[in-house]
């Protein structure tokens, strides 16, 4: 059984005996316990279980105790460490020197003991040794007897822990390519060096003929298929057929295609994570799957010119429910765009919520909207907006039909209600695919995302000579007047899901205008997640040594390892590039 990755908590202490160390033991260990309690009571793994912490077997005052802690952490699947102390300790003697996991140090801001002095000293040692560490120091002085964690310290501890857990959850998993390069899209030219060196992941690949082989040979659960077919007939609405008359398929052929795409979903899922039921049916090899945390399906053109497209499979894999009930989502990229798949994965691991995969299709200026519709944009939309749309791989949770405190949200599966599932299905239909583009047919997904949701759009790009770079745009979904929506939506493919998105502007750089956001976006796709998580993404990127080339996160929310400041404090973007380039990938 694979263990969850854990956070290791290291209480370090002044090693001087005969009074000094003894007087600090309880306070120091209590700091460790309070951090562990904070993390375990606040954060959850993607399966909904509380995050686990491991505390060192004793306080750490000298090298043998640091070594004992290191050994315990190795056995306990610790993916990151947090060192805590209220006092002076011996810097390089007590530090954790593991170079391939993130580290953070919280130095208590008090006057009785110099916790801040240790923090500065050990961070200097980390910088000298080339092992980055995040420094955490409360803004306000606390009393020595104060056991509470200040709010600013909590925020940094949790931001660090979320990002660190993401690195641990990715390590030793796989990206599964189903097919190869789709229509020459750069993101579907899968780069194994990137996955191995930056994420600690491996790459697996199957030809798309694996789908037809499993269908032809019955390598799927026939009982589940019958249950799925019944559920789809009762719950999934087939949408309007927009095809011209000579391309409309017969009712009999559409019914066959529904059966086909349901099997595609089952096979795609089984390829990713396996299915013990297949072993019972005599298919032991296929039952184990590919240990894939994220996958992509090429589809176009070789598959979709002949077979039904992958939209239904992609949509329901990314969605938090199916005929088996409510469950955690899979992370699945259309067109095998591995870089957008990784963008979705970053978002998912930081939020435990499903993702919208979309083309960054169109920038609508206020002037263009006025000319086409007669409508004057206002509010969040006043500066214009982006049309996000793609036929597949867009979670049904993207409808915004789930709610929290009366507002539309996308939330973890363990919070999802059956009534919200039904609302998502009611507000979605599945039109027959546009056969001018998808000659083999299939079914696309059509819905409109509710407005006023805070969201973050993300894209990872590969730059020759530099490596991966990340771009982040926080903003809000929009709800346009119905007639305006239909006028704009019908100018593209009305059979696809639409999200109207207004990025938050800052007045500088790539965020001077919505046009500049569109113009600086690095690829044709984006990964959209619920919430403003740009600060968490920046922290995660720094752990992986991926520079951020574009973001609209307030400077006070940026949290990177302390040695980033030694690369410069005025131009943070350039300092980020230099730090990442010098330190190199986390797993190299």
UniProtKB/Swiss-Prot annotation:
Signal peptide: none annotated. The keyword Manganese applies. Its main location: cytoplasm. Its EC number is 5.3.1.25. CDD domains: L-fucose_isomerase. Pathway: Carbohydrate degradation; L-fucose degradation; L-lactaldehyde and glycerone phosphate from L-fucose: step 1/3. GO terms for biological process: D-arabinose catabolic process; L-fucose catabolic process. Disulfide bonds: none annotated. Its cofactor is Mn(2+). It is an enzyme of class 5 (isomerase). It comes from the Bacteria. The active site is at 335 (proton acceptor), 359 (proton acceptor). GO terms for molecular function: arabinose isomerase activity; L-fucose isomerase activity; manganese ion binding. Mn(2+) binds at residues 335, 359, 525. GO terms for cellular component: cytoplasm. It catalyses: L-fucose = L-fuculose. Keywords: Carbohydrate metabolism, Cytoplasm, Fucose metabolism, Isomerase, Manganese, Metal-binding. Gene3D superfamilies: 3.40.50.1070, L-fucose Isomerase, Chain A, domain 2, L-fucose/L-arabinose isomerase, C-terminal. It is found in: Cytoplasm. NCBIfam families: fucI, PRK10991.1. Belongs to the L-fucose isomerase family. Converts the aldose L-fucose into the corresponding ketose L-fuculose. This is L-fucose isomerase.
């Amino acid at each position: 059984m694979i263990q969850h990755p854990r956070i290791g908590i290291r209480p370090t202490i002044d090693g001087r005996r005969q009074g000094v160390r003894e007087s600090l033991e309880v306070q120091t260990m209590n700091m460790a316990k309070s951090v562990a309690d904070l993390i375990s009571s606040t954060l959850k793994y993607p399966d909904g279980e509380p995050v686990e912490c491991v505390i060192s077997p004793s306080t750490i005052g000298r090298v043998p105790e640091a070594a004992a802690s290191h050994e315990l952490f190795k056995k306990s699947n610790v993916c990151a460490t947090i060192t805590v102390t209220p006092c002076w300790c011996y810097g390089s003697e007590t530090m954790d020197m593991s170079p391939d996991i993130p580290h953070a140090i919280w130095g208590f801001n008090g006057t009785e003991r110099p916790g801040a002095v240790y923090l500065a000293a050990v961070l200097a040692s980390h910088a000298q040794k080339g092992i980055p560490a995040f420094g955490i120091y409360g803004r306000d002085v606390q009393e020595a007897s104060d056991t509470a964690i200040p709010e600013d310290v909590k925020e940094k501890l949790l931001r660090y822990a979320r990002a660190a857990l993401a690195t641990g959850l990715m390590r030793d998993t796989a990206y599964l390519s189903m097919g190869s390069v789709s229509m020459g899209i750069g993101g579907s030219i899968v780069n194994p060096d990137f996955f191995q060196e930056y994420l600690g992941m491996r790459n697996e690949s199957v030809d798309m003929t694996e789908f037809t082989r499993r269908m032809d040979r019955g390598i799927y659960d026939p009982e589940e298929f019958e249950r799925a077919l019944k559920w789809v007939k009762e719950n999934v609405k087939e949408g309007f057929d927009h095809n011209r008359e000579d391309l409309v398929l017969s009712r009999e052929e559409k019914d066959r295609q529904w059966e086909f795409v349901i099997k595609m979903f089952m096979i795609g899922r089984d390829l990713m994570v396996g299915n013990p039921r297949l072993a019972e049916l005599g298919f032991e090899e296929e039952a184990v799957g590919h240990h894939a945390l994220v996958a992509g399906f090429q589809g176009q053109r070789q598959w979709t010119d002949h077979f039904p497209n992958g939209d239904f499979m992609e949509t329901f894999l990314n969605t938090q429910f199916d005929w088996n009930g409510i469950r955690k989502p899979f992370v699945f990229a259309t067109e095998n765009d591995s870089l957008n798949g990784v963008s979705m994965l970053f978002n998912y691991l930081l939020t435990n919520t499903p993702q919208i995969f979309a083309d960054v299709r169109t920038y609508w200026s206020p002037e263009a909207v006025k000319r086409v519709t007669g409508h004057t944009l206002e509010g969040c939309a006043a500066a214009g907006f982006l049309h996000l749309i793609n036929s597949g791989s867009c979670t049904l949770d993207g409808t915004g039909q789930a709610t929290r405190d009366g507002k539309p949200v996308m939330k973890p599966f363990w919070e999802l209600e059956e009534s919200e599932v039904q609302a998502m299905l009611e507000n979605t239909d599945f039109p027959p695919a546009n056969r001018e583009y998808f000659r083999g047919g299939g079914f696309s997904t059509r819905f409109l995302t509710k407005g006023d949701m805070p969201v973050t759009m993300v894209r990872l790009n590969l730059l020759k000579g530099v490596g991966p770079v990340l771009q982040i745009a926080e903003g809000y979904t929009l709800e346009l007047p119905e007639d305006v929506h239909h006028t704009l939506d019908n100018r593209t493919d009305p059979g696809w899901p639409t999200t109207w998105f207004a990025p938050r502007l800052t007045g500088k750089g790539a965020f001077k205008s919505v046009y500049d956001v569109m113009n600086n976006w690095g690829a044709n796709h984006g990964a959209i997640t619920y919430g403003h998580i740009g600060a968490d993404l920046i922290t995660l990127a720094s752990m992986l040594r991926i520079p951020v080339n574009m973001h609209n996160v307030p400077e006070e929310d940026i949290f990177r390892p302390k040695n980033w400041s030694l690369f410069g404090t005025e131009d943070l973007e350039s300092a980020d590039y230099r730090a990442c380039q010098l330190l190199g990938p986390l797993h190299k």
